[in-house]
Amino acid sequence: MSRPIRTLLFSTLYPSSARPVHGVFVETRLRELLRTGEVETKVLAPVPWFPSTDARWGEWAKMAATPARETRNGIDVLHPRYPVVPKVGMTVAPLLLAAAAIGPLRRLQAEGFDFDLIDAHYFYPDGVAAAVLARLLRKPLAITARGTDLNLIPRHALPRRMIRWAARRADASIGVCQALVDVLRGWHIDPSHLHVMRNGVDLNRFRPLSREQARRELGLDGAPLLLSVGHLIERKGHHLVIDALQLLCARFPQARLMIVGAGEERERLAQHACRREVASRVTFAGAIANDQLACWYSAADVLVLGSSREGWANVLLESMACGTPVVATNIWGTPEVVAPHVGRLVVERSGNAIADAVQQLLASPPSRVAVRDYAEGFGWEETSKSQLSLFGQLVSAERGRDDA
């Protein structure tokens, strides 16, 4: 092409000044793609409408405080509002998203940004809405599956039918791991439209720091330290890491756990730590900006991820890029991330299984240099090249149809 490919990224999973860590993994992939200099983009990231910015409303207040348009890291981001309808919201969300987006998309075109394709992230409701928009605007469409959009939501019959419809309408369906692509293949989606493009890790942002220095900065001593990073929701398994800590204290009586993240389970997790009699050994650090996490990973002896569902868990790569080994549940794309010499996978999702795996790593830790070396095989370059190649093919095919 004589000019850069123009993409329109469409997803409700995208950060804003009001919610800077929300969907940061989508922003990261886009920023890495833009570094090639071969793509221009704008982002349409719809936000549920809410009337109040009063802090007592928590996440809803942050949504209300999200600006209608902003520039993040040099990228023009629009945040149109869409209504959330109680009880039936899950069913009608794709149409409400599409209806909220069509006006802003037309305005972008009127401003001179006539994008070549839609790059949608998360199949439901985002991907379904994007399929509607792509059909209306006659644009090629790529949808990226990221986890629960294919390993949880399809348990509901109507969303499953809509997801299948969108996958058949899409010119390309991308999975961040092979396990997600296998779901689409099982639905008999055209194999030529299926692509695995794993998430990478920013090897400059996430790099090993001196453990002693990192602990000094965080006010920690030299005791064995477990780290659990993720939203404070049940499926992330923080409660299981607390269970594991209790069991580990028999052999490692000074062991501690740092939990990084915010969410609805904060108080329940604190109560759980009290019941397990390890409350004094558990610290809730709250949400930490992505660009500050390297210090936390470097301070830890082991990162633990006790999730029940993941597509491609970015925290595992971030930790390993900092030289810190990992323990994770053996689910979905996680076996594609963790090798035996840099961590442990647990088949049984329980505190006992996690404690056994952590104990193995504490007793015989892998070299931090070896862990970092392994993570260096997961940079973004390959994924960005694959995206460029795919997007170029989609745009060329669309132009060929127009010329026919």
Question: Would you name each region that the model predicts?
Answer:
Residues 24, 128, 224-247, 264-270, ...:
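A conserved mid-protein helix/loop that constitutes part of the nucleotide-sugar donor-binding site
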Residues 179, 200:
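Carbohydrate-associated surface elements
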Residues 287-288, 295-300:
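Short alpha-helical donor nucleotide-sugar binding micro-motif in glycosyltransferases
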